[in-house]
């Protein structure tokens, strides 16, 4: 994998709630492939000592900070202090890796992610995560702006 020196990895929403009950039966082979691929990319960034930023979705227990998620079929999820909100074991942050908590689909909305990326002089992002049609999509779109 060819990566520049100003590249960072965003590991988006790979959390216990989404993956703690993961089996081939309930996720299927494509999901396992996705998770294994995310780990391979993470291993490359770690080996090259490039910045890794873990994005964690977390909502207040009284639900005041939920957005459009509750308009659809998602329901309550990723509540602060819930074991399911913790990072998944497969991609758990190591010491020295960054963490950003978000409350919306995009990792940029209402967070300090842009400040962190500027401080690290990042000009290229690689994104991995489990929900590519929502959180990866919105984070990538906001990164492009």
Stretch-by-stretch model annotation:
Residues 1-93, 98:
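Active-site acidic carboxylates
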Residues 82, 88-130:
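Internal catalytic-core helix/loop-beta-alpha segment
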Residues 38-41, 113, 139:
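Hydrophobic residues within alpha-helices
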Residues 58-59, 105, 131-134:
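Acidic, glycine-rich active-site loops and adjacent beta-strand->loop/helix elements
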Residues 26-31, 126-133:
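Short, glycine-rich nucleotide/cofactor-binding loops
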Residues 136-145:
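Short Gly/Thr/Asp-enriched flexible loops that form oxyanion-binding sites at enzyme active sites
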């Amino acid at each position: 994998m060819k990566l520049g020196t100003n590249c960072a990895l965003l590991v988006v929403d790979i959390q216990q709630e989404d993956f703690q009950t993961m089996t081939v039966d309930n996720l299927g082979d494509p999901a396992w492939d996705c998770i294994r691929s995310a780990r391979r990319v993470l291993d490359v960034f770690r080996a090259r000592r490039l910045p890794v930023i873990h994005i964690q979705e977390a909502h207040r227990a009284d639900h005041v900070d939920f957005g459009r998620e509750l308009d659809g079929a998602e329901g309550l999820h990723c509540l602060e202090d819930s074991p399911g909100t913790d990072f998944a074991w497969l991609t758990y942050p190591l010491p020295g890796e960054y963490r950003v908590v978000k409350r919306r689909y995009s990792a940029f909305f209402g967070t300090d992610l842009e400040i962190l990326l500027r401080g690290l002089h990042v000009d290229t992002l690689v994104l991995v995560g489990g929900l590519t049609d929502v959180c990866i999509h919105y984070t990538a779109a906001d990164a492009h702006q």
